[in-house]
Amino acid sequence: MIYGISILLLFSPIFVSLCATEGYNQFLWPGDAPGEVPGEVGEETVEVKGVKRVSNVTKPTLTYYLSDSAKAKGTTVIVCPGGAYQILAIEHEGEDVCKWLNELGVHAVLLKYRVPRRKNREPHAAPLQDAQRAMSLVRLAGKSWNVPLTKLGILGFSAGGNLAVMTATSFHNRTYEKVDSSDELSCRPDFAIPLYPAYLLDEQTKNRLAPHINITKECPPFFFAHTGDDRIPAEGSVLIYLALEKAGVEGSELHVYPFGGHGYGLRKTKNPVSQWPDRAEAWMRSLKLLD
């Protein structure tokens, strides 16, 4: 066993590429993440009370779930759990989703991004830095897999859905200073799957998109699933879908189901919204992401 791995090697792009295999937890940042204030957030904790919750994340990580090489399609998805940017619902909106994607022949990477919200920063600011960094690191790692990465998407629930939207619309502006050569790789997702995404509407008017959401023709296609009785209004998903259509982005799909509430993840219910994984799979097939 080798113990003498230097810190520089541990965070080098070469080491990342070699070690990005199933079950490997990769730190995003070589040291403190950008903008972190030592002592602002307490020790990381994991709590299970019906829902497995992770809180106080200061050292964000990626956990790789690689599909069997006989099934692998070359498509990879970064998965972002929800939790109001306060905690992470890491199991039913994270680990379980990665395993489902593996069944489709899709590599999955679970992003444990920074929570809770940092003082004097937008709620999505630190998580967006983590997501942009993750996009580049996964692209680098995917070059060394038996089935090399060809398409990289992002999927998220609630606050994680907001993070998926922000990542898919903010790629033109990397929100941190370059760390290493991996940051030369694109942070633009090839597709996005926001599920009951939160915080999309302007806080003042509640009838238009938040001003920091910038939809252009360069945005990737989106798949949305939401419910009409969700406490997070479906209007945000609808407005982004319409903006994508207006911008000329092809291939997006929107589902608004009448019932189902919020926070269901992959859990089966009696409501039609439980069909969203099948609809998402069909959408991915229509874009040839599962070929």
Regions found by a protein language model. Give the residues of each.
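N-terminal cap/lid segment of alpha/beta-hydrolase-fold proteins
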Residues: T21-K71
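Short beta-strand element of the alpha/beta-hydrolase
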Residues: K73-G82
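Catalytic nucleophile-loop/oxyanion-hole region of alpha/beta-hydrolase
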Residues: A89-I90, D96-V97, Y113-L149, K270-V273
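Short amphipathic alpha-helix adjacent to the substrate-entry channel of hydrolases
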Residues: E91-V109
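Primarily recognizes the serine-hydrolase "nucleophile elbow" in alpha/beta-hydrolase
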Residues: Q129-K217
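Short beta-strand/loop motif that positions the catalytic acidic residue
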Residues: F223-H226
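Conserved alpha/beta-hydrolase "acid-adjacent" motif
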Residues: R231-G236
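C-terminal catalytic histidine-bearing segment of alpha/beta-hydrolase fold enzymes
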Residues: V238-Y241, K246-D291
